[in-house]
């Protein structure tokens, strides 16, 4: 990803650094409107996901995570910005006339050809079952359930590694550091997701953050006692308790949120690294 640095003409552009991406020109048959409401609230209006709200209107781009066009070659026509994810997307024109969006693989350029199916070349952007891949292959957009489409390693710069194959299962090392088993018949895409330098962007001003639908983050220690357990006191007072707490009084650090009995516990060989 190419980083574009602004000249220092105004305070808001003094430290701005954004990616010089191809402008978005979505196809009408691949987009539809979505009703965004709630602003991080649940059905009762209580905040369940903080610091969300506002933002520019978005059109959802329908992404092909299944890669159902088997053994039909396609050509990358455009590389576009997608407001619904931090990874870029690219438009594919297939030989049978179909046009679909997929996640942009790192290093892919306009004019490259891709294909999905069994016994296809181990090439960046191609999708094939794990059983046909050699060990050590870097992959993304990995299926968990056969035929459901890719669900793992879809964020910008995400990449997993195929480290073993035994019996009916394949062992993968995920971007989080977790090592788990997945059926060898599940499909994945070769390569790494593009837009690797997304974390190097500097928006330069608060207004650009608001356009993304992200609201300001306020520390609890500067609030009033009625708003947060850390609030109150004279001047710069400490939080007044042994351990940090959430706005609702629960422990803020180290609380486990995963269910104790889950079907995938037997498939996880090593937990993710924190």
UniProtKB/Swiss-Prot annotation:
Which segments carry the region annotation Disordered? 1-22, 223-274
Q: Name one Pfam family in it.
A: Ribosomal_L2
GO terms for CC? Answer: chloroplast; mitochondrial large ribosomal subunit
InterPro entries cross-referenced by the UniProt entry: NA-bd_OB-fold (IPR012340), Rib_uL2_dom2 (IPR014722), Ribosomal_uL2 (IPR002171), Ribosomal_uL2_bac/org-type (IPR005880), Ribosomal_uL2_C (IPR022669), Ribosomal_uL2_CS (IPR022671), Ribosomal_uL2_dom3 (IPR014726), Ribosomal_uL2_RNA-bd_dom (IPR022666)
What are the BP-aspect GO terms? Answer: mitochondrial translation
Give the primary localization class: plastid
**Is Ribosomal protein a UniProt keyword of this protein?**
yes
Q: Which UniProt keywords apply?
A: Chloroplast, Plastid, Ribonucleoprotein, Ribosomal protein
What does the record give under GO molecular function? Answer: rRNA binding; structural constituent of ribosome; transferase activity
Please state where this protein is localized: Plastid, Chloroplast
Q: Which residues form a coiled coil?
A: none
Alphabetized PANTHER family for the sequence = LARGE RIBOSOMAL SUBUNIT PROTEIN UL2M (PTHR13691:SF5), RIBOSOMAL PROTEIN L2 (PTHR13691)
Q: Which family does it belong to?
A: Belongs to the universal ribosomal protein uL2 family.
This protein's assembly is summarised as: Part of the 50S ribosomal subunit.
State the protein's name.
Large ribosomal subunit protein uL2cz/uL2cy
Q: Which species expresses this protein natively? A: Phaseolus vulgaris (Kidney bean)
**In the UniProt record, what gene is named as encoding this protein?**
rpl2-A
